[in-house]
Regions:
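Short beta-strand element of the alpha/beta-hydrolase
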Residues: 89-96
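Alpha/beta-hydrolase active-site loop
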Residues: 136-156
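Conserved small/polar residues in nucleotide/adenosyl-binding loops
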Residues: 185-192
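Short glycine-enriched nucleophile-adjacent loop
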Residues: 170-181
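Conserved alpha/beta-hydrolase
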Residues: 112-131
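An N-terminal hydrophobic leader/cap segment in hydrolases
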Residues: 14, 18-69
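Alpha/beta-hydrolase fold nucleophile elbow
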Residues: 156-167
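The serine-hydrolase catalytic nucleophile loop
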Residues: 98-111
Length: 194
């Protein structure tokens, strides 16, 4: 009988060690998968980097001005400037959402032009035609917005700048306009977060 209980104890210990080992293996495999996961597929979002055909058609057809500038760290930033047919000292910067590009903001262009604004559509860092491989969640995007506001002030020193963002763009607009020094440059920020 002692032999039976000793064998059962050893078997239970062996099974316990096997379960712990399997748990470590499964946990490590899950961790490795998370590090290399195609997040746009997992999250169900498609990266709209490649399809800028709507923007390019409007630039050619309607005379929208393609713009390229450099951020403070040298990253190439691309955008499209749309001057209002009426003379205006007000410009709104439209900021797209995560995994998108500036064409996401086209539906807002006519609304702002009807209200008398010039419009600047930008591709945020790591999106569309702008450089960078990913978003930095506001660490560098505020510097990028500094570069865009400087570009606008270079066109018109008295420009009044507003921002309208969608999702990630709304967060960037609010982060940017929430710092005291930058409030001097932005007249308003609109949040369009779902």
């Amino acid at each position: 009988m002692r032999f039976f209980f000793k064998t059962v104890k050893i078997l239970i210990l062996f099974l316990l060690l096997a379960f712990v080992g399997a748990g470590f293996y499964a946990g490590n495999a899950a961790y490795e998968t998370m590090l290399t996961a195609p997040w746009e597929k997992i999250l169900g979002v498609t990266k709209q980097t490649a399809d800028l055909s709507r923007i390019h058609r409007r630039e050619q057809k309607d005379g929208w001005q393609p713009v390229e500038i450099r951020s403070a760290d040298g990253t190439k930033l691309r955008g499209t400037y749309i001057e209002n047919s009426r003379s205006s000292d007000r410009t709104v910067i439209l900021l797209h959402g995560l995994y998108q590009n500036r064409s996401m903001c086209i539906p807002y262009v006519d609304m702002y032009r009807d209200m008398g604004y010039n419009v600047l559509l930008i591709d945020q860092r790591g999106h569309g035609e702008s450089g960078g491989s990913h978003t930095t969640w506001g660490l560098r995007e505020t510097d990028d917005l500094d570069a865009w506001t400087e570009w606008l002030r270079g066109k018109d020193g008295g420009v009044k700048i507003g921002m309208h963002g969608i999702s990630l763009g709304a967060a960037m607009a609010l982060i940017y306009s929430g710092t005291e020094s930058r409030l001097l440059y932005t007249s308003h920020a609109a949040d369009d977060t779902p």
